[in-house]
Curated annotation (Swiss-Prot):
Name assigned to this protein: Cytochrome b
Gene name for this UniProt entry: MT-CYB
Keywords: Electron transport, Heme, Iron, Membrane, Metal-binding, Mitochondrion, Mitochondrion inner membrane, Respiratory chain, Transmembrane, Transmembrane helix, Transport, Ubiquinone
Cofactor: heme b
Organism annotation: Marmota caligata
Additional facts recorded: Heme 1 (or BL or b562) is low-potential and absorbs at about 562 nm, and heme 2 (or BH or b566) is high-potential and absorbs at about 566 nm.
Pfam family of the protein (one): Cytochrome_B
Cofactor remark from the record: Binds 2 heme b groups non-covalently.
Binding site for a ubiquinone: 201
Length: 379
């Protein structure tokens, strides 16, 4: 009798995706982040669902309802801080996952790569709207500043902003719709994840060498299931350490003050995972230019397959490209730091230089170095 997992219509799909899936024998720990992102999404959906049971999306009661969750609901504080810090861990995994794709040339699977970038945009939008929900000072002013950027769009800008707000300022209508979108988007993300996996399994996984691995495949289970469990345990350890020892480490103290439209905080800044993009936005004095740079800072990832001029797929055997890649990583750390600093000398000029370097490395320096490496190898 044939094994049920190979014949049952539903179990067969799971089998081909997670059990009998042929995987390259040499994929490193950098390939663990896909499963970790799946875990993060599940954690966020479940903690978010339980938070939504107690949260009220009204300007008068939103802040109080979050306080109520933390004080009166059984383990409410745990659910709330797991959700807030879960977002941070989610973004750490996202950045590492994208960085891995850039380093090892995984972007040559361009359907998988482009859906991944759409996923990145969707997660960023979800996180932004989630940050508005507690209705603290930084929630309110963050929402005001970021939505206001759309007013830079010529002709339709102002109308568009008022349409998103549902009025003439960020108010009850804005909070209600942000809650609705924040609730529904993770399920859309989950559907997109399935499409992402569908396209990935059409081609199979890349591997550190960037070479075709068809001649040397091993089953996903037990080898990579065990490897993923190690990653899962480490992720849970990091998340729970953050939640139980310093839950407010990555948050903003201003968000413990209820939203007040009449009092602007001295430094409006988003959560840490948006700071690099925020620094790029602020480094351009023109409003429309800043908005374009902000969008392009992520959208530029879609150009990676077109900018790949090297004869080799991975950076594993390309030391010059490796060097530039790590300079890009250092540049992103610099931008993240600058995004959290006040707009004054010397931070302004450092931010501008770091922003120029970011686009220069991706659009100019990396492709040029790829051509130089081809020449050095007489290809």
């Amino acid at each position: 009798m044939t094994n049920t997992r190979k014949t049952h219509p539903l179990i067969k799909i799971i089998n081909h995706s997670f059990i009998d899936l042929p995987a390259p024998s040499n994929i490193s720990t950098w390939w663990n982040f896909g499963s970790l992102l799946g875990l993060c999404l599940v954690i966020q959906i479940f903690t978010g669902l339980f938070l939504a049971m107690h949260y009220t999306s009204d300007t008068l009661t939103a802040f109080s309802s979050v306080t109520h969750i933390c004080r009166d609901v059984n383990y409410g504080w745990l659910i709330r801080y797991m959700h807030a810090n879960g977002a941070s861990v989610f973004f750490i995994c996202l950045f590492l996952h994208v960085g891995r794709g850039m380093y090892y040339g995984s972007y040559t699977y361009f359907e998988t790569w482009n859906i991944g970038i759409i996923l990145l945009f969707a997660v960023m939008a979800t996180a932004f709207m989630g940050y508005v929900l507690p209705w603290g000072q930084m929630s309110f002013w963050g929402a005001t500043v970021i939505t206001n950027l759309l007013s830079a769009i010529p002709y339709i800008g102002t109308t568009l902003v008022e349409w998103i707000w549902g009025g003439f300022s960020v108010d009850k209508a804005t909070l209600t719709r942000f809650f609705a979108f924040h609730f529904v988007l993770p399920f859309i993300i989950a559907a997109l994840v399935m499409v992402h996996l569908l396209f990935l399994h059409e081609t199979g996984s890349n591997n550190p060498s960037g070479l075709i691995s068809d001649s040397d495949k091993i089953p996903f289970h037990p080898y990579y299931t065990i490897k993923d469990i190690l990653g899962v345990l480490l992720l849970i350890l990091i998340l729970m350490t953050l939640v139980l020892f310093s839950p407010d480490l990555l948050g903003d103290p201003d968000n413990y003050t209820p939203a007040n439209p009449l009092s602007t905080p001295p430094h409006i800044k988003p959560e840490w995972y948006f700071l690099f993009a925020y620094a790029i936005l602020r480094s351009i004095p023109n409003k429309l230019g800043g908005v374009l740079a902000l969008v392009l800072s992520i959208l530029i990832l879609m150009l990676f397959p077109l900018l790949h001029l090297s004869k080799q797929r991975s950076m594993m055997f390309r030391p010059l490209s490796q060097c530039m890649f790590w300079i890009l990583v250092a540049d992103l750390f610099t931008l993240t730091w600058i995004g959290g600093q006040p707009v004054e000398y010397p931070y302004i000029i450092i931010g501008q230089l770091a922003s120029i370097l970011y686009f220069a490395i991706i659009l100019l320096i990396l492709p040029t170095i790829s051509l130089i490496e081809n020449k050095l190898l007489k290809w």
